[in-house]
Amino acid sequence: METVQLRNPPRRQLKKLDEDSLTKQPEEVFDVLEKLGEGSYGSVYKAIHKETGQIVAIKQVPVESDLQEIIKEISIMQQCDSHHVVKYYGSYFKNTDLWIVMEYCGAGSVSDIIRLRNKTLTEDEIATILQSTLKGLEYLHFMRKIHRDIKAGNILLNTEGHAKLADFGVAGQLTDTMAKRNTVIGTPFWMAPEVIQEIGYNCVADIWSLGITAIEMAEGKPPYADIHPMRAIFMIPTNPPPTFRKPELWSDNFTDFVKQCLVKSPEQRATATQLLQHPFVKSAKGVSILRDLINEAMDVKLKRQESQQREVDQDDEENSEEDEMDSGTMVRAVGDEMGTVRVASTMTDGANTMIEHDDTLPSQLGTMVINAEDEEEEGTMKRRDETMQPAKPSFLEYFEQKEKENQINSFGKSIPGPLQNSSDWKVPQDGDYEFLKSWTVEDLQKRLLALDPMMEQEIEEIRQKYQSKRQPILDAIEAKKRRQQNF
């Protein structure tokens, strides 16, 4: 796929989308080829610019996402003009999505390459990547910008081996009147101590993250990766700076470079400009040293895609045969009380409906998600098929709501003393339910029966409160969409 791109170079270089292109629908300007993966706030797709033939990356972001953060990312990319930072070409509104058109880096992220090859990087490879990354950070920091999420997953390589900084979803701008920021943003294992402690931080917070990234490239994962992220957040500020698991495997120059990055006091930590003069970085070899590992990773990815396609084709054939056998058989849907019927099938619901691209490669050490126990394993998407549920008439909902209200009111009147006091209905703060032992079975049953309608009422109040906050935001977005089609 990439060899075709090299044999057929773009007819001219795309620098920025012109006004004529930006007033068209994005499908008129681009052909979307495939999904590349997930970034902060949206999905990323590979596409081709029809006029020039240039490959680009398009991030599609739902407008329900944090629009302020999306606009911040666009603003930062617009202001940047560096070979070491991913370029921004333009943006579109399409239905409920914002399309952000960016530079395409064909080799993917450094973490993608490590996982595809199932190998960590050599010192020479790390030095070359760090040199380009430091040039990108030097540029950002000169512009008074902090990236705040430096890690191998946010360092992209093009097919020639040039490293570029990407994913500015959490980047921040420093001003003269706000020399240090006080917000905790980033990925836990890569966070600088001062970021976690919220004591204010500046551009050298990125340097700490770069030191952790250097260890990540050398060992395959950052320090503390084997413990819970919340525990790591407490350990990073209190423990001494992390080092290599086996320091004897690495040169003195590399060890010293990491040591210079991982200084706990930000005032004593080296800057990007200073680290570009470090012997480990100054002795870095050219980008040609990265071509072998890039080609190896792309070969692995291509083979996996071909294998997946064969499995899909085989499944399609099997499903086609099953559809022929099952056609015309109608059964009642499980839990369907309104008489709706559906076609019976031996296929399980949702089988083979989502192909997980290997180039997506979700990092196990990525952005922290709390309370994610309900997520399916191996990236499986859990689908809720609302079309199978029978529509409930509005009059039925009205009577059900009235019945719940009557139940709540009647409980307050009919239940005996122990239950009439509203304070008794609250969950005891100390978790002590001993008082229930003195109640009769009838009292307990009435209390149990009252919980469901009370819960429904509380949920409805929360829903209305959420809607009252959400609607003005949606109205503002709609107003902006009507006033302008693009940025």
Swiss-Prot record:
**What residues sit in the active site?**
D149 (proton acceptor)
* Site entry: Cleavage: D326, S327, D349, G350
Annotated Protein kinase domain ranges read 30-281
Question: Phosphoserine is carried by which residues?
Answer: S265, S320, S410, S414
Compartments annotated for it: namely: Cytoplasm; Nucleus
Molecular function (GO) terms for this protein are: ATP binding; metal ion binding; protein serine kinase activity; protein serine/threonine kinase activity
Entry GO CC: cytoplasm; nucleus
Q: In this chain, where does the modification Phosphotyrosine occur?
A: Y433
Q: Which domain of life is it from?
A: Eukaryota
Using the record's annotation, list all stretches that form the SARAH domain.
Answer: 433-480
Which protein family is named in the record? Belongs to the protein kinase superfamily. STE Ser/Thr protein kinase family. STE20 subfamily.
State what protein this is by name. Answer: Serine/threonine-protein kinase 4
Q: Which gene encodes it?
A: STK4
